[in-house]
Amino acid sequence: MDLNQRKEKKGQHVGCCGSRTDLSADTVELIERMDRLAENQATASMSIVALPSSFQESNSSDRCRKYCSSDEDSDTCIHGSANASTNATTNSSTNATTTASINVRTSATTTASINVRTSATTTESTNSNTNATTTESTNSSTNATTTASINVRTSATTTESTNSSTNATTTASINVRTSATTTESTNSSTNATTTASINVRTSATTTESTNSNTNASTNATTNSSTNATTTASTNVRTSATTNATTNSSTNATTTASTNVRTSATTTASTNVRTSATTTASINVRTSATTTESINSSTNATTTESTNSNTSATTTESTDSNTNATTTASINVRTSATTTESTNSNTSATTTESTDSNTSATTTASTNSSTNATTTASTNSSTNATTTESTNASAKEDANKDGNAEDNRFHPVTDINKESYKRKGSQMVFLERKKLKAQFPNTSENMNVLQFLGFRSDEIKHLFLYGIDIYFCPEGVFTQYGLCKGCQKMFGLCVCWAGQKVSYRRIAWEALAVERMLRNDEEYKEYLEDIEPYHGDPVGYLKYFSVKRREIYSQIQRNYAWYLAITRRRETISVLDSTRGKQGSQVFRMSGRQIKELYYKVWSNLRESKTEVLQYFLNWDEKKCREEWEAKDDTVFVEALEKVGVFQRLRSMTSAGLQGPQYVKLQFSRHHRQLRSRYELSLGMHLRDQLALGVTPSKVPHWTAFLSMLIGLFYNKTFRQKLEYLLEQISEMWLLPHWLDLANVEVLAADNTRVPLYMLMVAVHKELDSDDVPDGRFDIILLCRDSSREVGE
């Protein structure tokens, strides 16, 4: 039975309370098989005990009670043993339970432990062994559970552990062995789970580990082996997951490793083997993923490596083999990706290499082989890419020694394009029709916020000004030689006549929306997670749209404060911020004092010809005379580029998560509306200076003003201090929202209004010096970071 047939064939399970649950065909077949086995067991042993005919329909304990005598720790058992032992423990619960079972041994043991809960439970099982053991542990929970199972062994063991949770669970299973073991571990969670499975072995093992999470899960599977092993490791996460699969082996192994994440995942697959192995490695991430695949083998292996990322991914594939191998390497990234492919072999291999990047990618391909190989090389990049091709082979082989900078050319691809010359092919036509229905407003000025369901008044303030293709990191939605609208080969283009907003544009806006919801570290990890879609904006939109409702709700929650300030114009008063009044003298200054300080800062910057963006980024007073003498925006930006401001910004801050031109292009046409508002306010600044009785000085022009706000945005130390002091605001991760927020007005301590950006400059100055009205700050620098760390 193929994958689609298995998806279509479903049954309904009537639960014990009369509820109905849709089950897959495999699970229905499993329950029926278990019913028949249970009936055979009941018939064979009727002279001894009457067992229920089904695990789902009745309380078997009550029905069998008249035939069986009860034991001290067991209920209606034949040839069963239930033991519970507690020795020298404090606040410890040890439980052993056996119900309606034959030839069952259930044991729970706790030794020399504090605040430990150890439980072993066996229910309606035959020839089942369930063990839970905890030894010399503190705050440790060890659980072993077996339910409605035949010939099942379930074990959970924790030894000399602290704050460790070890769980082994088997549910409605036949001939299944499920084991979870933790040895000499601290703050370690080890889990092994088997659900509705036949002839399945699931094991999770952690040995001499600290802060380690090891998980092995098997769900609704047949003849499946799932293993997760961690040995002598620190801060390691090892996971092996198999879901709704048949004859599938999923393995994740980590050995003698530090800060390593090793994951192997198989979902809705048949005859699939997925393996992820990391050996003697430090700071290594090794992942192998197979999704909705048949007869597919996906392997990711890292051996004796440092700071190495090895990934193998197969998605919705048939008869596909995807391999990524890294051996004896340092700072090496090896990736093999296969997406929506049939009979496709994708391999990436790196051997005894240093600082080497080897990638092999196959996307939406049939009968395609893509290989990238690097052997005994240093500083070498080897890439092989096949996209939306049939019977295509793309191969790059760098077999060199020494400081090689090879394979910088486009991959040589042998592609048979004849079958794709017809744009009206049925596949392309159906895909185009489906996308047009999903994004119906692309003939108008649609944006991703409309797609998510935001109202026009909300979109006005959440709008992604300045977000363009340069927002995307290099390599994300930026492939050349393909359709600019969908990034597909021209013969497979899914764009349609009259489309004003491209799918690629919606995709980069969707990426910006995801950035709205993530801090720097979370966004880095997200970019790694979507690596299979880096060359496929249409595929990414499909992935993004699945979480459409969730994303909408999350934005509404996280940005409620922002919309209240920018849309409903709720007033920010510094006196409402308790932390601000206690931790900063700026929050006790009058509006006049804040303005005086703002103009003084700019007067000093102009006099010293200090580079503005760098100063507000990290208080660095580098000189840049060309910036102050620039007559137009172009010359201004060229001056910044000449002194390396943009390069330093990318290397020091989260600006490195965008394309190299992103910040530079903010000085072009992106913020015309905000620029108009600022230039209209210049007259107000002159009147303010006259009213304050100070000598009028030239206020910063637009490009200098924008430099200030960009520097403040990427200044991590300043941002954290401001968000701590000003309690009405919270974290935000997009520059356009920061620019909008900076221009709202706030009430100073004397209830006079000042722009928020003036308050920002005052806080920034407070973090650096005591050069403020009324002398020295008396409480400043409560949060001051003398190291002034910037960015990520």
Swiss-Prot record:
Residues 113-417 are annotated as: Disordered. Residues 91-390 are annotated as: 25 X 12 AA tandem repeat of N-[SV]-[RS]-T-[NS]-A-T-T-T-[AE]-[ST]-[IT]. Coiled coil: none annotated. One of its GO terms (cellular component) is cytoplasm. Residues 394-417 have a biased composition (Basic and acidic residues). Keywords: Repeat. Residues 118-393 have a biased composition (Low complexity). InterPro entries: RLR_Helicase. Sequence repeats lie at residues 91-102, 103-114, 115-126, 127-138, 139-150, 151-162, 163-174, 175-186, 187-198, 199-210, 211-222, 223-234, 235-246, 247-258, 259-270, 271-282, 283-294, 295-306, 307-318, 319-330, 331-342, 343-354, 355-366, 367-378, 379-390. PANTHER family: FANCONI ANEMIA GROUP M PROTEIN (PTHR14074:SF39), HELICASE WITH DEATH DOMAIN-RELATED (PTHR14074). This is Uncharacterized protein YBL113C. It comes from Saccharomyces cerevisiae (strain ATCC 204508 / S288c).
